[in-house]
Amino acid sequence: MGVIQTLDRLMTNPMPEGRVEDILRPEGENPLLEKGYVTTSVDALLNWARTGSMWPMTFGLACCAVEMMHAGASRLDLDRYGVVFRPSPRQSDVMIVAGTLVNKMAPALRKVYDQMPDPKWVISMGSCANGGGYYHYSYSVVRGCDRIVPVDIYVPGCPPTAEALVYGILQLQKKIWRTQTIAR
């Protein structure tokens, strides 16, 4: 039932709602729906599939990783958003960088990012991953993981709550909805 409602939202020939642009549309049911056809753009279909099956690669480096585990636990249950944690970068399309990134770990982060298939997205979780955090002036700390990999969503906090990470994932889903895969 949920898939049909989602596909109804993606259709390019929706039900008339009495607005000005619906004047030329027939007042009855949608004729394409009556025949069993659903029309949509390829971009909308791909983005719908991508938002419903985001598989993050966890890159937990410090205390933010504990909150990331809380987000995957039963209270918030990221599975209901289609988010399933994967153990391999080759199986994931989202990387969650959680915690302090040091200079010695930066090449490993880049290598894991490069192993992910396209399209790929990065969520930076916590003050340390966003800009160095408490250890910003330490000689061995990278002042933000965006110096190593491109970041799509920043989740602030020290450590951010599990709810903040869920909100960041929902923001990433909105960002994916706005992307265009097929060039016009």
Swiss-Prot record:
NCBIfam families given in the database record: nuoB_fam, PRK06411.1
Keyword Protein biosynthesis listed: no
Membrane topology: Peripheral membrane protein
Gene Ontology CC terms, in alphabetical order: plasma membrane; respiratory chain complex I
Similarity remark: Belongs to the complex I 20 kDa subunit family.
Positions with a binding annotation for [4Fe-4S] cluster: C63, C64, C128, C158
GO biological process terms on file: aerobic respiration; electron transport coupled proton transport
Gene symbol of the encoding locus: nuoB
Keyword Transport: yes
InterPro entries assigned: NADH_UbQ_OxRdtase-like_20kDa, NADH_UQ_OxRdtase_20Kd_su
Pfam families, per the entry: Oxidored_q6 (PF01058)
Parts of the chain that traverse the membrane: none
PANTHER family reported for this sequence: NADH DEHYDROGENASE (PTHR11995), NADH DEHYDROGENASE [UBIQUINONE] IRON-SULFUR PROTEIN 7, MITOCHONDRIAL (PTHR11995:SF14)
Catalytically driven reaction(s): a quinone + NADH + 5 H(+)(in) = a quinol + NAD(+) + 4 H(+)(out)
Protein species of origin: Xanthomonas oryzae pv. oryzae (strain KACC10331 / KXO85)
Role: NDH-1 shuttles electrons from NADH, via FMN and iron-sulfur (Fe-S) centers, to quinones in the respiratory chain. The immediate electron acceptor for the enzyme in this species is believed to be ubiquinone. Couples the redox reaction to proton translocation (for every two electrons transferred, four hydrogen ions are translocated across the cytoplasmic membrane), and thus conserves the redox energy in a proton gradient.
Name of the protein this chain belongs to: NADH-quinone oxidoreductase subunit B
PROSITE patterns associated with the record: COMPLEX1_20K
Enzyme Commission number(s) of this protein: 7.1.1.-
